C-alpha cells in the first residue's frame, strides 16, 4: 500500500515536470516564430540579408549608408553593430541605469540624464556629442531597457542588451537611435589639430 502511494506520487511529480517542460517548449517555439517573422520583415523591408536558426538569427546589410550587423540569441540577448567614422578616435560607453520607481513620467532630458551613465576618454567629446537635444531625445527611451550598453571603439558602434527583441519596430528603433548617434560622432571632426 505504501509502495503504491510512493509510485503514484512519483508519477504525479514526473507528469508535472513533463507538463512544465512541454509548456516551456511551446513558449520557446512561439518566441522563435515571432523572432523570425519580426527580423525577417525588417530585413526584407530594407533589403538586408536575414539568416535564421533555431537559437540564433542575424541581419546584415546597409542602413542609411552604414554597414550593420545584428545578432540575436536566446541565451545572450542581442548585439547590434554599425560602422561609423570616428575622426577624433574617441571612445564612448553608454550604460542604462536602473531607474528609480519615483521617476514615473520624466521628460526626455531627465530620462537621458538619470537613465544613462556616460564614459569617454574625453569630456569635451561627450559635451559636444550630446549638445544636440534631438540626439538626447532619440536615445532617452533606450534608458528604460535594463542592461543596455552602447560602446564606440575605433570605427565600430555597438549596442548590446541581455534581452532578445523580436519585433521589427523594436529593431528599427535601435537602428534609428544608433544611426543618429553615429551621425553625431561623425559631425565631430579634427580641423588643424583641434576639434571644431
Named regions from a protein language model:
Residues 1-12:
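Feature marks short, highly hydrophobic, charge-poor N-terminal signal-anchor/signal peptide-like helices
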Residues 17-45:
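Transmembrane-cytosolic junction motif
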Residues 10, 36-77, 81, 85-196:
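Charged, low-complexity intrinsically disordered regions
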Amino acid at each position: 500500500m505504501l509502495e503504491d502511494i510512493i509510485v503514484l506520487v512519483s508519477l504525479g511529480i514526473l507528469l508535472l515536470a513533463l507538463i512544465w517542460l512541454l509548456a516551456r517548449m511551446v513558449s520557446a517555439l512561439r518566441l522563435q516564430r515571432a523572432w523570425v517573422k519580426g527580423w525577417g520583415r525588417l530585413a526584407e523591408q530594407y533589403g538586408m540579408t536575414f539568416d535564421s536558426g533555431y537559437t540564433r538569427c542575424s541581419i546584415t546589410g546597409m542602413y542609411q549608408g552604414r554597414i550593420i550587423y545584428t545578432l540575436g540569441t536566446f541565451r545572450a540577448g542581442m548585439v547590434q553593430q554599425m560602422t561609423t567614422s570616428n575622426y577624433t578616435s574617441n571612445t564612448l560607453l553608454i550604460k542604462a541605469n536602473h531607474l528609480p520607481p519615483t521617476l514615473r513620467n520624466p521628460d526626455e532630458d531627465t530620462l537621458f540624464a538619470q537613465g544613462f551613465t556616460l564614459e569617454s576618454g574625453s569630456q569635451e567629446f561627450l559635451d559636444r556629442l550630446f549638445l544636440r537635444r534631438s540626439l538626447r531625445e532619440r536615445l532617452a527611451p533606450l534608458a528604460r531597457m535594463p542592461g543596455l550598453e552602447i560602446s564606440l571603439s575605433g570605427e565600430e558602434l555597438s549596442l548590446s542588451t541581455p534581452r532578445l527583441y523580436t519585433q521589427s519596430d523594436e529593431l528599427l528603433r535601435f537602428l534609428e537611435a544608433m544611426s543618429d548617434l553615429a551621425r553625431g560622432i561623425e559631425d565631430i571632426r579634427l580641423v588643424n589639430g583641434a576639434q571644431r
